[in-house]
Amino acid sequence: MSQSAFGSAARINWKELYKRAIKLPSKRVGHAIEDWVASQSPMGNSPVIDAKTFDWVERLEKSSDVIRQELLALLDAQKHLPNIQELSPRQMNLSREDGWKSYFFYVLGHRIDASYRRCPETGKLLDSIPGLALAFFSVLAPGMHIKRHRGSYKGVLRCHLGLIVPEPRTSVRMQVADKMIYWEEGKCIIFDDTHKHEVWNDTDGIRVVLLFDVCRPLPRWLTAVNKFVLSLGGYLPEAHRLLRTQREWEARSAALANPL
């Protein structure tokens, strides 16, 4: 082969080739699948869903004071909850600051027993929610901004139960697609996180929600497929890393609370 041929090969933009040959077609297929899944669901492709659609919402909202008391006890005992980037490194793409803390209860079929022991009433309420896939306290520090992003799986809906919402409420907000949302203490917000969304806390106080995912309502056969796919997610390395890191944090916290 001539040197010019080698030179031509060297000039190939392999990154662009990968993008055109694999990444973009895969993304188009993924979006087509998402659109089809949405078409099978009673809420369609709506970015924000009426919380009254789910009968467990009223029960959860009525119990928000109990959950808040357990949260406050946790925050009082544990001044330094883990940063979400420690538990899930890919969240570094959204924020590299130390102002987004988390405390997990449930991850894709794996219950974190230590969290249930610390917050037993919260745990009982989570267990009563059908199709629970993920659950944690999400704590956002003053001045925090979570960049615009989207979830990767259409089979779940994301729920936020407002627990601590600082004033002015209009300065702590989330945009989902073209809709601006403001949290309210004791109220649930439900949205499809495959729509791009962004979060701001432009107040002097922390914002805390109980964040959890539930299975999207689908026909029975598709619900079975959806639950199977979610159960496989529990075996992914990232899920196991998150569980391991949270358990290590719990062990360190227990050791500090009960020194020899």
Residue ranges and their predicted role:
Residues 125-127, 146-153, 172-174, 200-202:
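Short histidine-centered beta-strand/loop micro-motifs
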Residues 1-150, 221-260:
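Fe(II)/2-oxoglutarate oxygenase catalytic core
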Residues 139-141, 152-168:
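Short, conserved beta-strand element in jelly-roll/cupin
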Residues 158-162, 190, 205-220:
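A short hydrophobic beta-strand segment most commonly corresponding to one strand
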Residues 181-196:
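Conserved metal-binding segment of the jelly-roll/cupin
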Residues 195-209:
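Ligand-binding loop in jelly-roll beta-barrel domains
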Residues 164-185:
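A short beta-strand-loop-beta hairpin characteristic of the jelly-roll/cupin
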